[in-house]
Regions:
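Residues on a specific face of well-ordered alpha-helices
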Residues: 75, 124-128, 167
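Short, contiguous strand/loop micro-motifs
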Residues: 9-11, 61-65, 87, 113-114
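Structural beta-alpha unit
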Residues: 1, 25, 29, 41, ...
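Small/aliphatic-rich secondary-structure junction motif
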Residues: 1-57, 132-135, 144-183
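Short beta->alpha connector loops
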Residues: 13-14, 93-97, 117-118, 159-160
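A short acidic, glycine-rich active-site loop
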Residues: 56-72
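A structural preference for short, hydrophobic beta-strand core positions in alpha/beta folds
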Residues: 36, 88-91, 139
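Gly/Ser-rich helix-loop-strand patches that form or flank binding pockets
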Residues: 20-29, 99-145
Length: 183
């Protein structure tokens, strides 16, 4: 058992380098194909003094800004990924959670930052992603560049979901210094 395809989600409002570095490290460790992914959605309503309205010109400006940022993220991803790692890029101007959930069907592991989940138009909803993707999700701190699984703690509940989560995480447990289980 191994991860053959890893998706790394680049949040539109976060620095991309740390999460890309984690993705590269995991792809090299498992010999996996790395997919860089980014998405953001234009909010359909714009707040004005008269309330929430549809404003086509403002929405187009926001879409242009999103497309520009997606191009910047792609450039960083392509610059950072070494030629020894096979990779590809995917982006969309749509819901980041929905896009990542759909793209996850072609991956064995999803790597994403914890991000700012308050803006569903610009950040992934971790809860919805975890429940809807059907794939293991590794959530990293925003500034984390390396995976250090020295100690693994297993909180166990004898359910199908818990057994699946433990099975999905087994690859990370090959080399921890200690493995603990709460009593």
């Amino acid at each position: 058992m191994s991860y053959k395809s890893i998706i790394v989600n680049l949040a539109i409002d976060e620095a991309p380098a740390p999460i890309v570095q984690v993705g590269i490290e995991l792809a090299e460790r498992f010999g996996a194909h790395l997919v860089g992914l980014a998405a953001a959605e234009v909010p359909p309503l714009v707040p004005t003094g008269e309330g929430m309205v549809y404003e086509g010109e403002i929405m187009q400006i926001q879409r242009t800004e999103i497309e520009k940022r997606l191009a910047e993220l792609r450039a960083v991803f392509e610059r950072m990924v070494p030629v020894s790692v096979t990779s590809e890029w995917a982006q969309s101007v749509c819901s980041p959670t929905r896009f990542l959930s759909v793209m996850a069907r072609a991956a064995d592991l999803i790597v994403t930052g914890c991000g700012d989940g308050d803006n569903v138009f610009r950040a992934v909803d971790i809860g919805s992603l975890t429940l809807g993707a059907g794939r293991p999700v590794l959530v990293t701190a925003g500034n984390m560049e390396h995976i250090r699984a020295k100690t693994v703690l297993v909180a166990w509940k004898d359910t199908r979901e818990a057994r699946r989560a433990v099975a999905d995480a087994l690859l990370f447990w090959k080399r921890p210094a200690t493995l603990s289980s709460p009593r």
